[in-house]
Amino acid sequence: MKRVAVLVSGGGTNLQALLESEQRGENPNGKIVLVVASKPGVYALERAANFGVESAVVSRRDYASSADFDAALLGVLQAHDIDVVVLAGFLSVLGERVIAAYRNKIINVHPSLIPSFCGPGFYGLKVHEAALARGVKLTGATVHLVNEECDGGPILLQKAVAVQPGDTPETLQKRVMVEAEWQLLPKALAMVCSDE
């Protein structure tokens, strides 16, 4: 059984999808044992508590350097014997030490069809604003393995979502979450936990 940590920075809607998927038995080879938030007080921590999952806060602001933050995060993950890491709206960049320690065992969900609207500066509503400004007809979500390149790791799963007339960044964001992210992320986690 793979021990999974989910890293979050906000409300934790993707975390909720992962926890509910696990509760339905859709990841028989993995168990979420830790939620790490990038700041205190985020609703994702309450979601973790509601499912009886231990949580921790590792905030980049509390460390003098990126290397110190990386070391602290790695220490928390290793102290909990974590095998697989999920970035579910985690807005801090992982450093080389964490990536090296969990090579091919870190997955990220990105709210676009990579290689479109990805890389530095493309996160949250900014992705959907860019998609609408460009006038794309399809957007979606991608789950990929994490490497040293921002949004550059091997793609595991993608799902397209149609852009509707009158969409705002907020309505598009919600539809991409419901129709793509919440479907793909649990499937990708099950794949990684099964060593697929």
Model regions: which residues?
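Charged helix-capping and loop-helix junction motifs
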Residues: 68-74, 123-127
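N-terminal Rossmann-like dinucleotide-binding module
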Residues: 1-43
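Short, surface-exposed acidic-centric catalytic microdomains
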Residues: 28-68
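Donor/substrate-binding cores of folate-linked one-carbon enzymes
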Residues: 84, 88-195
